[in-house]
Amino acid sequence: MKIGVPKEIKPQENRIGLTPDSVKVLTSNGNEVLVEKNGGLEAGFDNEQYKNAGAKLVDKAEDIFNDSEIIVKVKEPLSNEVKMIKENQIVFTYLHLAAAKELTQGLIDSKGVCIAYETVTDNNGRL
C-alpha cells in the first residue's frame, strides 16, 4: 500500500499522523510511505528521521493526496484537503462529524472511505 502523511494545517495542531517509528514498521512490511517535508518538525521529528525510517519526502500535500491509497492525519481535513480526497481513497483521522455538517457532506461527496479514530473500537466495544 502507498500511505501518505500530509502536514497538519489546522491552526494550533502540531502533531503528525505517523511517527518515524511507525513509518519504519510500515515500510519494513512492504508499504511505501510518503511524508510531507517538514511535516513532523513541530512534533519533534525532522526530515532525516523520516528518511532513515524509509519514508519518501514529498514537497506538497497535493502530491501526497494524488499518489496515496491511504491518508493518515491527526485532525479533520479542512475544506481544501477535502477537495483532494479521491474516490475510494482511505482517510484515517479524527473527524468529529457530529458538529460538522459541511465537512460531512464534503466527505460523502468525495466518495472516499473515511474512518474516524473516535469511532474505532475493539471486539469489546472499547475505544
What are these regions (language model features)?
Residues 5, 66, 72-73, 92-93:
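Redox-cofactor binding/interface segments in oxidoreductases and associated redox assembly factors
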Residues 69-73, 77-83:
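Glycine-rich phosphate/dinucleotide-binding loop and adjoining beta-alpha-beta core of small-molecule
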Residues 34-57:
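N-terminal beta-loop-helix "entrance" segment that forms/cooperates
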Residues 6-42:
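Glycine-rich phosphate/diphosphate-binding loop of Rossmann-like nucleotide-binding domains
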Residues 2, 8, 79-127:
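Glycine/serine-rich phosphate-binding loop and adjoining beta1-alpha1 elements at the start
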Residues 54-67:
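Short acidic low-complexity segments
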Residues 31, 55, 112:
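Short phosphate-binding/catalytic loops that engage adenosine nucleotides
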